[in-house]
């Protein structure tokens, strides 16, 4: 099994001849992620962990029937609703719930419930006024 971190939340898992991309996201201009969208488009199986844009913003590119990418996207209900607002055709979007098992050849992915951090006011203020965040607005 090979796991490759691709920046932000993006991870590529390779095992038993299968490749799965989790949370594809291309860094905003000026960011530290050296990847571009073309680095992701060869992947045909996408898993989105939750519906925030930094986890699914690039996913519509994989669902574009005019691109060569046309992947199958596994995601929860909220992410699926977000994607349905972003693209016309969601026939390749598969809704999953905690406890579901995604089977890809000999690879099994168990869908688990996750808890997203809920920052308080001080953490939000620190993030919004951090040098790393403000660089995007130069």
Q: How would you name each of these model-derived features?
A:
Residues 2-5, 26-32, 91-94:
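Short gly/ser/thr-rich secondary-structure transition/capping motifs
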Residues 8-10, 99:
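Short hydrophobic/aromatic beta-strand or adjacent loop that forms the aromatic wall/cage
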Residues 57-68, 78-79, 84-88:
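Metal-dependent catalytic neighborhoods of phosphoester/phosphodiester hydrolases
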Residues 76-138:
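Metallo-beta-lactamase
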């Amino acid at each position: 099994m090979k796991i490759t971190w691709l920046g932000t939340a993006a991870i590529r898992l390779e095992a038993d001849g299968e490749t799965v991309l989790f949370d594809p996201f291309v860094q905003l201009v000026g960011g530290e992620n050296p990847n571009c969208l073309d680095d992701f488009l060869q992947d045909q199986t996408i898993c989105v962990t939750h519906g925030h844009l930094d986890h699914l913003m690039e996913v519509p590119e994989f669902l574009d029937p005019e691109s060569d990418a046309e992947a199958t996207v596994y995601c929860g209900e909220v992410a699926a609703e977000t994607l349905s607002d972003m693209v016309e055709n969601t026939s390749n979007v598969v809704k999953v719930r905690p406890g579901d098992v995604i089977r890809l050849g000999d690879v099994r992915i168990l869908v688990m419930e996750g808890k997203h951090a809920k920052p308080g006011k001080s953490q939000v203020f620190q993030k919004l006024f951090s040098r790393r965040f403000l660089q995007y607005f130069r």
